């Protein structure tokens, strides 16, 4: 496995794949070809670009004016992307369905790396890398991953997805009551039903960026409005910050000005990791733990920009320390700060609508080394 050489199937390999510790690099498929896939494209009334109906794909016209010539199905303007994708599924008879939005450009051969994964019958969905706008939340990077709530790649955008038809039917498709976040909800329900979902950046597609900052703000705020509904449907899955008790205490102490206790906690917990990993050199385990502390700090800064900024902003009115926190969070990623703040605006709108604080509550795990006492 370490040398990226072929390995025989085994229970250990299955456990590692299931945990997302390793990722498959399958040979090009011998089971499925592009003829086993039907492309479904919702053409929304407000789409910034359009596709040519009649190019072999199933095109769902959602309230276009004038109507899209050659569309397979027409829906009223009140429909959304979830309803359009579900309608497209009703006329598909292939084993796989590729849902591709109208503002996404694909390249020749983009399906081949994705279809190779479907040789594994446990695979329900695979998504390509979506490139386009710099620092876009749609671009999830160059590393393959298992998609699972709370993991490194906890979601994939619905801009381009290839889904096994049987998996789609088992979970009932997309939830048409969700105007935003229906793609995240769909992937999480597939995972909860036992289907593996994978992110495969060996395949890339291009997503047309929004044309103005105003459109980008509206787009990101729209994404944010889905957070409350998703947090209620999938408790704990949308926590803005995840940490263990030692790391959380160290950062809270530092922000409170208690530099000494923060340093002792961070260094002490890093040193304590060594005896728990006897096969790893102490220096390596120490560096690993310290990197974990630093990574948690970056994630906390991202949470300030994205969902905690109203709280930090109020605190900054009366506290110099809160003002420093706000400045540090913005400087940590200056480029994404405007769209992060727009996303947070949407999150708070959704929280008000659904009357819940769930999207801004962090998840702090048990203190490392401590196990719950049996009842």
Residue ranges and their predicted role:
Residues 16, 159-163, 167-172, 177-204:
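A short, conserved alpha-helix in the catalytic core of glycosyltransferases
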Residues 97:
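Short aromatic/hydrophobic "clamp" motif used to bind/position activated sugar donors
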Residues 108-138, 208:
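Conserved donor NDP-sugar-binding/catalytic core segment of glycosyltransferases
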Residues 132-133, 145-166, 179:
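A recurrent flexible, glycine/aromatic-enriched loop bordering the glycosyltransferase active site
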Residues 1-54:
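N-proximal low-complexity "stem/linker" segments adjacent to membrane-targeting elements
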Residues 101-105:
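The conserved acidic donor/metal-binding loop of glycosyltransferases
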Residues 75-92, 147-155, 159:
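Glycine-rich, basic loop-to-helix element that forms the pyrophosphate-binding segment
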Residues 200-201, 206-265, 274-355, 362:
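Active-site-adjacent helix/loop segment of glycosyltransferases
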